[in-house]
Every structure is written in structure tokens, then in C-alpha cells.
């Protein structure tokens, strides 16, 4: 997938419903995405931040609440690359 296509997938995911097959994506967080859970708990935000650390290669100290929908879209894409039992994402 080309870089611009990846951005389109992420941007498109912000407004659309999240359809994730939990049998394909084994991390339990993916089932929360599938149910369109509210990402208002500290635990969920920390998990999302951890994925962002992997994606960006550096630690972020704070997450802006206004950016959660973008993060959810990013997690949706990253779930497709999750490596079971490793807490790692293969990008």
C-alpha cells in the first residue's frame, strides 16, 4: 500500500463505522474497536499511546482528547498488523 493510500485509509476511518473482524485481529482491544467503544478511560488511552510510540518511534507524554478519533483510526489500521502474544505491531 502506497503512503498516500495509507493516509486515505486512516482519514476515511474517522467518519466511517469501524468494521473489524476480531477473529482476524487477535488483540482484545480490536474487539473494543469493533463495538465502537468510547475511548474515555485512561487505560484505553495509554494503550493507544503505546501503539503511537511504536508507530512514531518515540514516546508521547500526553494525548489530546480532540485527537482520539484520529488515534482510533490509526489503531484500526495497526490492528491489521498486530503480532499475537508480542504486543508489537509489524509495519
From Swiss-Prot:
Domain of life: Bacteria
Example GO BP: DNA replication
Keywords recorded for this protein, A-Z: DNA replication, Plasmid, Plasmid copy control
Protein name: Putative defective replication initiation protein
Amino acid at each position: 500500500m502506497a503512503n498516500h493510500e495509507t493516509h486515505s485509509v486512516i482519514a476515511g476511518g474517522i467518519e466511517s463505522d469501524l468494521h473489524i473482524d476480531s477473529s482476524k485481529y487477535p488483540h482484545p482491544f480490536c474487539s473494543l474497536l469493533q463495538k465502537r467503544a468510547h475511548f474515555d478511560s485512561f487505560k484505553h488511552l495509554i494503550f493507544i499511546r503505546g501503539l503511537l510510540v511504536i508507530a512514531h518511534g518515540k514516546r508521547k507524554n500526553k494525548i489530546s482528547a480532540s485527537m482520539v478519533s484520529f488515534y482510533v483510526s490509526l489503531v484500526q489500521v495497526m490492528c491489521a498488523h498486530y503480532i499475537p502474544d508480542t504486543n508489537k505491531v509489524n509495519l
